[in-house]
Amino acid sequence: YKGVFTGVGGPCLITPNRLTLPDMLRKKGYETAMFGKWHIGLTAFDKKGKPINRNGLDAVREIDYSRKLEGGPLDRGFDHFFGTASCPTTDWLYAYVDGDRIPVPPTQIVDRGPLPKHPYSRDNRPGMIAPNFDLEEVDQVFLKKSLEFLERHKKQKPDKPFFLFHSMQAVHLPSFPGKDFKGKTDSGPHGDFIFEMDHIVGELTKALEAHGFADDTLVVFSSDNGPEVPTVINMRKTHKHDGARPWRGVKRDNWEGGHRVPFIARWPGKVKAGAISNQTICLTDLMATCAEIVDVKLPNDAAEDSYNFLPVLLGKDKGKQIREYTLHQTISLAMAIRRGSWKYLDHKGSGGSN
């Protein structure tokens, strides 16, 4: 996957013929949209039409921005996309992707001099930046796009179901909260960034309510990994806060703090407010769960690692584990397996960054 996570370095990790969640829902009549970071690879081309399958500043300079991108959200089941190829404030290409093109190409090297300097400002690589790309306001741009989609959908297709995937930069390092959120907390820049994330979720929730979608919409809030090393170390020192507590480990580890994340669901009339489950689920399980909700029988070559947790959401699982086992992997490709309350790590230590 060299290049996939750090720029327009394709190919996409999802193979072209594999059934995806948005593709499945689109076939059931849903309008599908994604706004935010894609981060699983898409392919750009140079002026000779050759694919650029690597990352770095030199690769970004070789891109022919007049050509379409391949392997992005529009090729994997989404009707609409506006966002970035990978982490918008981390990786070498600092420009927005609109559909399958980059309408405003990067024109200059990122000047990181004016950016905030604090323990949470690392992970901002040198790269090329577009004139309309403000490193501190990307999440507000993503929010604006999602809100516009909901408003447009209400006006144009009020009776058509929709699937919206809002993929935030917050709270991935570097912690660059928007100008309206700086100083909002007494927990420093990272606390302010968390505040901004909370604001975004609130604005999306209010929009669902304002347009009359809230009572018939399943909302899921989650994350893709545990907290980053600098946030844990520095927040422990300065604010007595530990984003992984009580679990050991951080992002990229096989210890539980590396992969155990929040999972919050809101579905009025279906999910009991305030209910808590001790089920072990994986984000891959969303595919089988949504298939059950929309009455789709998944083919054998789709979502092989996905388990239906709809009974858990509805409070009908009676405590029975839905997963036979769950696999985990670190940045160094070290593996671990979990079955019930037992865990086996095929390595010494965390296997990752800790």
Task: Describe each model-derived feature in a short phrase.
Residues 1-353:
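Formylglycine-dependent sulfatase
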